[in-house]
Amino acid sequence: MLHIVEYTVGPMEQPLGEFEQLVLMAIVRLEGDAYGATIKRDIEARTGRGLAISAVYTTLERLEQKGCVRSWIGQPTAERGGRRRKHFELKPAGARALRAAYSAYTEMAAGLERRLKALR
């Protein structure tokens, strides 16, 4: 995936990178079931990239600091040996940044399909 434009969010207007955009997209797709492992699997399945779980968690922490996502700790589950999961959801700033990124990407991609097929 090309990283065409950087988007800014939050009070410090920090840039939103390509992987941050992918993480935000995964959170939206996963709705209430967005936690580190499901986010990792979603991105891997859709991009064909192999990811380290640490990269996902580092990005989630950064997105939380930027005010794009919020997290909460779920209830312990038997499948996790009584451990809890940390879930994530978009905050309004994250939704705005993702909408802007999506809009710019689709605008930039408009009309490229035919031309890309013609390239050798």
How should these model regions be labeled?
Residues 56-63:
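Basic amphipathic alpha-helical segments that dock to polyanions
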Residues 66-81, 89:
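Beta-hairpin "wing" of winged helix-turn-helix
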Residues 24, 87-89:
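Short aromatic/hydrophobic contact patches that present stacked aromatics
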Residues 1-14:
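Short, intrinsically disordered or compositionally biased N-terminal tails of bacterial proteins
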Residues 15, 61, 78-80:
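Short secondary-structure boundary/capping segments
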Residues 13-55:
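N-terminal helix-turn-helix DNA-binding core of bacterial DNA-binding proteins
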Residues 84:
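Exposed loop/turn and edge beta-strand positions of beta-sandwich/beta-sheet ligand-binding modules
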Residues 4, 93-120:
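Amphipathic alpha-helical dimerization/coiled-coil segments
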